Amino acid sequence: MSGAGANYWIARLLAVIAGLLGALLAMATPFLPVNQNTAQLNWPQNSTFESVEAPLIGYVATGLNVTVPCAAAAGLTGPQSAGQTVLLSTVPKQAPKAVDRGLLIQRANDDLVLVVRNVPVVSAPMSQVLSPACQRLTFAAYFDKITAEFVGLTYGPNAEHPGVPLRGERSGYDFRPQIVGVFTDLSGPIPTGLNFSATIDTRYSSSPTLLKTIAMILGVVLTIVALVALHLLDTADGTQHRRLLPSRWWSIGCLDGLVITILAWWHFVGANTSDDGYILTMARVSEHAGYMANYYRWFGTPEAPFGWYYDLLALWAHVTTTSAWMRVPTLAMALTCWWLISREVIPRLGHAAKASRAAAWTAAGMFLAVWLPLDNGLRPEPIIALGILLTWCSVERAVATSRLLPVAVACIVGALTLFSGPTGIASIGALLVAVGPLLTILQRRSKQFGAVPLVAPILAASTVTAILIFRDQTFAGESQASLLKRAVGPSLKWFDEHIRYERLFMASPDGSVARRFAVLALLVALSVAVAMSLRKGRIPGLAAGPSRRIIGITVTSFLAMMFTPTKWTHHFGVFAGLAGSLGALAAVAVASAALRSRRNRTVFAAVVLFVVALSFASVNGWWYVSNFGVPWSNSFPKLRWSLTTALLELTVIVLLLAAWFHFVATTNGSAKTRFGVRIDRIVQSPIAIATWSLVIFEVASLTMAMIGQYPAWTVGKSNLQALTGQTCGLAEEVLVEQDPNAGMLLPVSTPVADALGSSLAEAFTANGIPADVSADPVMEPPGDRSFVKENGMTTGGEAGNEGGTNATPGINGSRAQLPYNLDPARTPVLGSWQSGIQVVARLRSGWYRLPARDKAGPLLVVSAAGRFDHHEVKLQWATDSGAASGQPGGAFQFSDVGASPAWRNLRLPLSAIPSMATQIRLVADDEDLAPQHWIALTPPRIPQLRTLQDVVGYQDPVFLDWLVGLAFPCQRPFDHQYGVDETPKWRILPDRFGAEANSPVMDNNGGGPLGVTELLLKATTVASYLKDDWSRDWGALQRLTPYYPNAQPARLSLGTTTRSGLWNPAPLRH
């Protein structure tokens, strides 16, 4: 150690002690004890046979003990007990798959049977159960085994072990039953000894103990002290303090203004990402829950170690949950990224980049081309993109100044970025690529102070993030959660990375024009930068170190992305900041100073054109509501050639021009005129032209959608309206028909029961409807199979519309079960379905009276089922005289919104019908003799409509599917606390494609809320429509009705206890 080092002995001592202690406390944080909130579900409550609801978010209890006196089974016998079969169950007996997933103690014929997850554990004849010998039935369930016994009874003489106590046991599998409450068919006072006690898994409902709090505070303070000491050691080099921010940091140029304008406008009209509703709902519910649970999957386990960013969003949501407000941090990150690119990255790349306008414009175009389609939401990609840039800037400052405090800052930022989300793994590259220069600095400085005083603060900085991650959780809990997520999935391997690129080349929002171009342009810029660096050792005019590190970070980030457990294209959003930096590198690389050959520049232009052509071989599609009204969202228009073909042909022409330059015009003539100079400069920046063209295309597309759809709802309109105080989004535009019977039109001269087929009804009959009309899947041909899961439960928005039969015939003798709560006693129905020989069917209804237009709603609706073409069902209108003479004035086709053959509502705006019309009738022709082709109709009606906001309101607990959360900011997601979910009253689903794709994510296999609600509640679709966009499939509203309507929320026995960081009550069942 030198003499100068001896003068800093206090700083050295502080750096060593504070750094090592800070790191030790940070690493000890996961293992320190926490205060756990405990909860016990005990039943009976109120001393009566009263069913209670207690849907466990983790599905099962850590331990369950049940004791039932044998005398209690007497309530299941006798003529007065008809229909009463369940003595006790943890799931309603009416629920699909109740026997497969729950515990039921029930009467089966003349036996009392205890069944757990479809496995009979023990049973006894009712005669023996009610005999004096039988004392009680006991049951215990733990993760390793379940046991049940009829105390007092023994196996009979014909059994394998006669005289042995009548008991059963199952092990070798986690048989713990799912619990959504305690239900019984019995009533009245309870017998003595009846007891149900479940220990609810609340391992994640915890808070730090005083010891852990003190340790965390000391860990943070000591880390700060260590960093101050490291700064003092850095100052020993004798150099003066350098500005933290460049001198022109706050100045705004024309390009800055343009980028700010685009980002600000896109903030309002731009498309969002698919997971925004997922993340927003988690954030909204976390405060009441006490931790950031993964609300839609994985049995309520916490998001940690990736949840700290979502905690910030939870705080942000205290002001308002509107989209425009919740994404303000994202906008701030976008602006910060651009400021770093333009003021830190480009100047550090060297004089050629700093002096080149093409470099700045290309950097801006590349940055926007990636940011706009991938980062305009609540996902963590924006903060990861920013974190990567900040880490690189800190590393570059360390290399430039030969100081180590920036290294420590880079470690903190890198760790925060790493734990912002699974894709934060890309931040590792920012540190790895600079290991060589940083080790050189450390080696040089250690000669002066020794290695330990320099390394200890960096170690503390690298580990301090553990305090944030494990502040209220334990090592055991997080380890169990990570193992469960890996087991449940999705958990793809590194060699499955090809799936991400396969999705990128699908004609879907995942592989849309914008996303595909963003990634391909990034790869082109990276390829050019790598090629030039390999060919000449460096890109001429650029600083070798910083430019190589930018390239290295990008390459390592692509490699690191291989290890993320999911493979979605929105993960490419982490490259937004790097894309801008690479854009600057590529612009300099292809400039005339670096790439003098016109042939080579022309070939590069052809490559860029090919990338554009490949990008447009897709759709201009966006996720869910962001796609409303967007032009070419399904396909691009074709004139003589498709746009992709035209771009490909242009690519060939440019390649032929390059061949001309190679074989004929081999000299590089210089431009002689000012116009020629400008043309030459433009040709030298093809990637800038392409990126800015795509940016303009994207912004114009979403702006056109907002203007073209007006006054109908769009994302842009909703965000702009939020500035005026209209903050409820789509809930104010979805119109709900609560009572479809109230809007039914009356026939002019025929009884209601006969009017539907009074003019003509050939092969249309009251029972011409199959019993099952479940919808076909979106992705399968019509009629291939019904859109139901293997367990028989629908997953889309048509719950309650899949048909069935009634025991009592309706007004016209039909036994068909009608949708949307249509009353069969008031609503006739006719259908053309028939088994056996098929014949042509025709229907002409009687005339129905139209009400006065000023007293009618905006829409005319007919509930229909079947598979048919639009032209096969029509509405004819007439005046009174025209109807009397049988001369209709004209006809209209309906908009058929929904999935066939399920019941859905055919729609026709009332404004389309001439004002002179006073009567209407239905006309249907089924001339297709295919057995799966049929039509069923109910009478026309004009719905009485209220907004979804008025119907659902602010307070009712709602099951918001994860795609819809951002579009419905005023609806309250159902809460969970102490391991128990609140029972929702409504469910809001996305459009049919989204419902089919995403409902499986939330089902019982993944540990989501759908696996709870389908056992506890019956879903019925409520008719709804999107205002002024009547033919739009916006989604669906479902009313959730408990199978046991009188069941009340259970009262839990709460407590608090202290748990070690290694405590584990039981494995998480999955």
UniProtKB/Swiss-Prot annotation:
The gene is embC. It is a multi-pass membrane protein. It is found in: Cell membrane. Keywords: Cell membrane, Cell wall biogenesis/degradation, Glycosyltransferase, Membrane, Transferase, Transmembrane, Transmembrane helix. The chain crosses the membrane at residues 10-32, 210-232, 247-269, 399-421, 425-442, 449-471, 512-534, 547-564, 574-596, 603-625, 645-664, 685-707. This is Probable arabinosyltransferase C. One of its GO terms (molecular function) is arabinosyltransferase activity. Pfam families: Arabino_trans_C, Arabino_trans_N, Arabinose_trans.
